[in-house]
C-alpha cells in the first residue's frame, strides 16, 4: 500500500507542477531547434541530449528537454504513429488484477520494446515505474521517473491547452492521451482535428477544474505524414 501511495503522490505532484507552469509557456521554435540539435558543438546536440536522458540525468534543463523531445522529429527513427504490436501485449498484462513475477518481467520487456521505437512513450515509462516500485528498485525508479519528468515538462511548457491558440505541442498522438492524467484529467470520449490550425482537441470527463477540452498542436505529425504522401495517424 505504501508503494502505491508513493506512486499516486508522485503523479499528483507532477500534475500540480504542470498547472503551475500555465503562465510560463512558449511554443517550440522548430527551425531553431533543428539547427541546434544538428550542430555537434552545440549543448543541444541531439545525441548528447539523448545520452543524458537515457541516463536519467537530473541536471537536464527544461530547454534541453524541449530540444530533446521536439528535436526527435528530425531523427531518422521518428515515427509519428503507433505501429508496435507490443502496445496490445503491454495493455493485456496491465489489465490483470494482480501481477506475478513473470508478469513483471513481461511488462519490462514490452515497455523496453516500445521505448526503442518511441523513447518518450509515457505509457511504457509508467509501466516500468509500476514494476520498479513493487520491486523496491529505487535506483531504476528514480531514473525512469526523471525521464518521465523531462517528457511531461517538454509538453506542458509549450502552452496551456485551453484553446486552439495556446495548445500543448506533441510529436505523437498517443502522447496527447498519456499526458492527460498528469494534468489531472481523464479522456471524455471525443477526439477532433481542426485541420486549418493543425490542432487536435480531446474532450474531458468531469474534472475539478471545470475544463471541457484540451487542445494539442499536432503540426509535427501532420507535416511528417504529408511529406510522405499522407497516411493515418
Task: Set out the residue ranges of the language-model regions.
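N-terminal alpha-helical interaction modules that lie
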Residues: 21-104, 165-233
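Bacterial Sec-dependent N-terminal signal peptides
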Residues: 1-26
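Alpha-helical solenoid repeat scaffolds, predominantly canonical TPR units
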Residues: 103, 110-111, 143-147
Amino acid at each position: 500500500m505504501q508503494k502505491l501511495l508513493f506512486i499516486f503522490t508522485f503523479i499528483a505532484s507532477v500534475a500540480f507542477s504542470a498547472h503551475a507552469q500555465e503562465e510560463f509557456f512558449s511554443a517550440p521554435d522548430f527551425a531553431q531547434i533543428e539547427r541546434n540539435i544538428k550542430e555537434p558543438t552545440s549543448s543541444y546536440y541531439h545525441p548528447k541530449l539523448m545520452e543524458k536522458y537515457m541516463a536519467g540525468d537530473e541536471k537536464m534543463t527544461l530547454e534541453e528537454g524541449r530540444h530533446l523531445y521536439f528535436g526527435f522529429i528530425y531523427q531518422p527513427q521518428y515515427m509519428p504513429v503507433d505501429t508496435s504490436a507490443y502496445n496490445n501485449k503491454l495493455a493485456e498484462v496491465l489489465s490483470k488484477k494482480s501481477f506475478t513475477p513473470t508478469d513483471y518481467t513481461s511488462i519490462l520487456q514490452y515497455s523496453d520494446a516500445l521505448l526503442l521505437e518511441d523513447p518518450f512513450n509515457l505509457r511504457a515509462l509508467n509501466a516500468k515505474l509500476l514494476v520498479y516500485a513493487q520491486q523496491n528498485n529505487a535506483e531504476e525508479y528514480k531514473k525512469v521517473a526523471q525521464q518521465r519528468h523531462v517528457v511531461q515538462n517538454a509538453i506542458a511548457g509549450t502552452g496551456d491547452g485551453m484553446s486552439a491558440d495556446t495548445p500543448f505541442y506533441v510529436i505523437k498522438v498517443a502522447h496527447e492521451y498519456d499526458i492527460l492524467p498528469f494534468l489531472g484529467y481523464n479522456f471524455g470520449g471525443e477526439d477532433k482535428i481542426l485541420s486549418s490550425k493543425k490542432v487536435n482537441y480531446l474532450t474531458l470527463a468531469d474534472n475539478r477544474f471545470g475544463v471541457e477540452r484540451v487542445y494539442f498542436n499536432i503540426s509535427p505529425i501532420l507535416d511528417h505524414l504529408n511529406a510522405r504522401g499522407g497516411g493515418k495517424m
